[in-house]
């Protein structure tokens, strides 16, 4: 299995800066998306730190272990990298008054062979398109999701709820954070979408489905998704990562050959 990956981020129509951050390492199948929060550009700092830090640590580990790593090993490495990133952001936030309280959501995927390991914190999401069916693989860590789970609000009312952007878990806000990790089997033709809530707050699932099913390259689909969010108001930064699973064999990199992997 090989993966084609593309990314796109846009500030939207109402924000002066972009507090979303994306980091991808195509050689190891690592995709990271973070949506920062905090005043005075602190959200931009938090998301940028998360994306850069996790990419640096996780991509290095993946390059060394390669396809020989088990799902359990990938899960543990992901958890450690996120723990380290959380500590780094939390320390920075408490060392600089300008950054106090900053944090970020996180959704990341490690695409290896016929499996993907997903990690997420907050309300940035991962969807899978298999055939003509779109499935949300991650569950938001948010007050609204808790209300939905408890039956306190209907799905229809949730679309206009004032609690829709209140996350219950974020990277860098507290000294310890728990990343939710899940593994899924990948099939040839699967398409994966990692996105910030700037997309999902503006674009309905049925419209995302239509775009994912439409003709064109991944880059075309990413551009259409961002345009749809802006057409519906673009009230937040919009970021997407698209990954397409294709039949093929990954060529070993230089480091893997040196390590005899």
Locations of regions flagged by a protein language model:
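PP2C/PPM-type serine/threonine phosphatase catalytic domain
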Residues: 1-261
